[in-house]
Swiss-Prot record:
HAMAP family: EFP
Protein name per Swiss-Prot or TrEMBL: Elongation factor P-like protein
GO biological process per UniProt: peptide biosynthetic process
Protein family per UniProt: Belongs to the elongation factor P family.
Top-rank taxon, per record: Bacteria
Pfam families: EFP (PF01132), EFP_N (PF08207), Elong-fact-P_C (PF09285)
One GO cellular component, as annotated: cytoplasm
Organism of origin: Proteus mirabilis (strain HI4320)
GO molecular function: translation elongation factor activity
């Protein structure tokens, strides 16, 4: 059991007879005095894969579920199934393409360090990605010299097909760091 204001992204809760995995949290502070802060949470129903949105007050009590997290790395594709290998005991974890469609936009061909599989009682529930990923821009309009002073952006295509907004001074071939949850440009990659 935890209060709504203690819930973090990646946690799992049981609510309305559903197992829900927290994907995103928006905190809405009210302008009126005495009103409590609202937490708008976006979930994925672990059993059905549906997206669910709920609002909670900061002091609402939610039933949290303990999940097991296992570090994995991408192994291979078998038809429409993606296989990830446990980094310690080499157990394979299989996901159908439609289960991890969003996550695949952030996994480059060479793989991504920091991925975890979430399991509960031996059942595979979800694939969790790290906060950021470094990728190379494969297509964008040419960079404009001297554009670093303006805050204007342009679309850039990445190797996985993901398109995000980047500053105008970047060009094709530049490596950038992307915040996965917010799908936004963070800066140049090291």
């Amino acid at each position: 059991m935890a209060k709504a204001n203690e819930i973090k992204r990646g946690m799992a809760i049981s609510y309305n007879n559903k197992l829900l995995l927290v994907k995103d949290i928006d905190i809405q502070a009210p302008s009126a005095r005495g009103a409590s802060t609202l937490y708008k949470m976006r979930f994925t129903d672990i059993r059905t894969g549906q997206k669910v949105e709920e609002r909670f007050k900061g002091d609402d009590i939610l039933d949290t579920i303990n999940l097991t997290r296992r570090a994995v790395s991408f192994s291979y594709i078998d038809g429409d199934e993606y296989v990830f290998m446990d980094n310690e005991d080499y157990t394979p974890y299989t996901f159908k393409k439609d289960q991890i469609e969003e996550e695949l936009l952030f996994i480059p061909e060479e793989g991504l360090a920091g991925m975890q599989v979430l399991t509960m009682d031996g059942q595979v529930l979800a694939l969790e990605l790290p906060q950021t990923v470094d990728m190379e821009i494969i297509e964008t309009v040419p960079g404009i010299k001297g554009a670093s002073a303006s805050a204007r952006t342009k679309p850039a295509t990445l190797p996985t097909g993901l398109v995000i907004q980047v500053p105008e001074y970047l060009s094709t071939g530049d490596k950038i760091r992307i915040h996965i949850a917010e799908r936004r440009y963070m800066g140049r990659a090291d």
